[in-house]
Amino acid sequence: VGAEQTRRWESGALAHGVTDPFGQGPLPWLRGADQYFGDTGLMVPWYVDPALLPAARRSPDYDPKPALGRPRTSDDVGGQIKGFAAGATDLGGSLDLRVSVNPPQEFTVDVYRIGHYGGAGARHMAASPRVSGLVQPAPLVAGRTVSCHHWWMSWRLQVPLHWTPGAYVAVLTTADHRHRSHIPFTVRAGRAADLLLLLPDVTWQAYNLYPEDGRTGASLYHAWNEKGELLGEPAAATTVSFDRPYAGAGLPLHIGHAYDFIRWAERYGYDLAYANATDLHAGRVDPTRYRGLIFPGHDEYWSAPMRRAVERARDGGTSLVFLSANTMYWQVQLHQGPAGEPDRLLTCSKRQAETPASVLWRDLGEPEQQLMGIQYSGRVPEPVPMVVHNTDHWVWEGTGLRDGEEIPALVAGESDRYFPRVPLPESTERVLLAHSPYKDVRGVGRHQETSLYRAASGAHVFASGTFAWSPALDRPGHTDERVQRATANLLDRICKVH
């Protein structure tokens, strides 16, 4: 492959089926001078190669060669170090890491927990000894489905009982300190909490193009042909495997949204439990035990068991907080993997010539709006202001906002709105908190809306209708105190602080 193509794949952020202006976000253990440009304080996401930036935006001390002691991100062409794990475990449980190292050499694992931690963004929790590394077998390919379930276990992480449940990242570093990669995972808790945060690992896997090598990789959006050309959805995979690394840096494309919310929520002391969407699907967590469920980021792919569990929770009085857009758009199925482990394959037969029937929830007679109060409308080419409405509502209390005022760049990525001809959920109260005009990629005028309703059970259901809400809570360069206050008003009401 050409050098220019290789550089694109190094980022792990090829053009997927969605424009996400926030993506993976900055991570604290990757901070360095080459991530800040000029005197403006503008932060460029850590996964962007400075060599590809205009010279005017590079740091004055930018060196095209990685500094000694500062590893580069592994890529899927060289596969210098890549790994994956099951995705979640319990306190007192264990997690098996399967890692490939090319060329073979020892490597280390550093485990971090995402949180505020006085502004640090994460805390170092554990470090492995040096682990023997080997080149694992090539991924197995069946049709467009790529799986590494046959990789050998490299290292087992024992999770102590005294750790705090949460979102964790295992950082893999080669012994020569030249390359680094990541394995995200979740530590669940047996105890109840006020709020259950559900990390959207089903959607993360739908977008995973591993390996981004110009030949083998496939997601539900893309695949390559024999010429190395990237193909679109009609030729993409219909089934993808959880048993493989994430492309590029080893982190899901949209993971930064969840990390933004976690840092903010833990800073202000909200009582959180953690689980993955696959846990919700499998019934490993009971959402009715919580006052509220938090969906912190892009959460597009839902199975029927996921939706039914959330509907039951709402009808039992559990509030729902959707902090992104394009939620619950596609219906998917989860199946056991080749080794018999449950829920290791994700299937969504969308936009395929041989399967013309739609698998959109709205086309199956269950539009998203029936649960969330609004539903997906379209992509937002460039961030635009959110125009607030009904500012006398308690959600906007203390923000200082008045009807018609704007919150800059808060509508971004994708948007939701209310569809008048689509059934609404039963409610005792309902309000639209924003109505924001924008133009789509064809220049056609559209609008975004933010919704809140109260179910007969007393549950509040909030939907932000934009990708930019979570980043406004704790993303450097994107925070907005009014969004922070509105979110606090919502969660305080759900947690019955008042």
Task: Pin down the residues of each PLM region.
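An acidic, glycine-rich "communication" segment
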Residues: 328-443
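Structural motif
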Residues: 169, 196, 291-296, 321, ...
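Active-site rim elements
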Residues: 249-252, 356-367, 470-480
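Extracellular low-complexity, Gly/Ser/Thr-rich intrinsically disordered linkers
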Residues: 265-267, 417, 425-498
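Proline/serine/threonine-rich low-complexity linkers at boundaries of modular beta-sandwich domains
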Residues: 17-79
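Aromatic-Pro/Gly-enriched surface loop or interdomain linker
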Residues: 104-129, 177-287
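Ligand-binding face of N-terminal immunoglobulin V-set domains in extracellular IgSF glycoproteins
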Residues: 81-106, 110-117, 122-185
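Helical hinge/lid and interdomain linker segments adjacent to catalytic or ligand-binding clefts
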Residues: 134-149, 154-158, 164, 250-336
